[in-house]
Curated annotation (Swiss-Prot):
Binding site for S-adenosyl-L-methionine: 106, 125-130
Official protein name in the record: Ribosomal RNA large subunit methyltransferase H
MF-aspect GO terms: rRNA (pseudouridine-N3-)-methyltransferase activity
Physiological role: Specifically methylates the pseudouridine at position 1915 (m3Psi1915) in 23S rRNA.
Subcellular location: Cytoplasm
Organism: Syntrophobacter fumaroxidans (strain DSM 10017 / MPOB)
Amino acid sequence: MQIHLVFVGKTVFPDVETGIERYVSRLNHYLPTRIHYVKAEKIPPRGMESAVLEKECERILKLIGGKSNQLIVWDRTGKHLDSLEFARVLERLSNGGTGAVWMIIGGPLGISRELRDRANLVLALSEMTFPHDLARLIVAEQLYRAFTIIRGEPYHK
């Protein structure tokens, strides 16, 4: 199985980018993991948000094309899982012969309805709102944590 992390827009804070890269490097010991960046649109005037989300959605769908075996979208409206439940989801996907898992973290306006509807799973990080850079770091860390749980390694306590 491969993991593809799709981020809308660039990571702003270099220290956060370093943290994301560190977790992705650790993840690569378990399975191939790649980060893909999709261009973010500028924040539009009020009432034009859906047009921006549609453009970003088009870019994401062009990137993943027909390659997506599993699409997981991170969105505030998603399901809440703890780390053990998230590990079980990934373990089922891995054991089920899933070739690739595409995980999408949207930009400042979130994720389009079309992407949420296409997703096999919509997950939320928290009831709280996080900066997108921090959300990316949390997802990368939780992926690493999940695979240490699956392997029975001592990282997760």
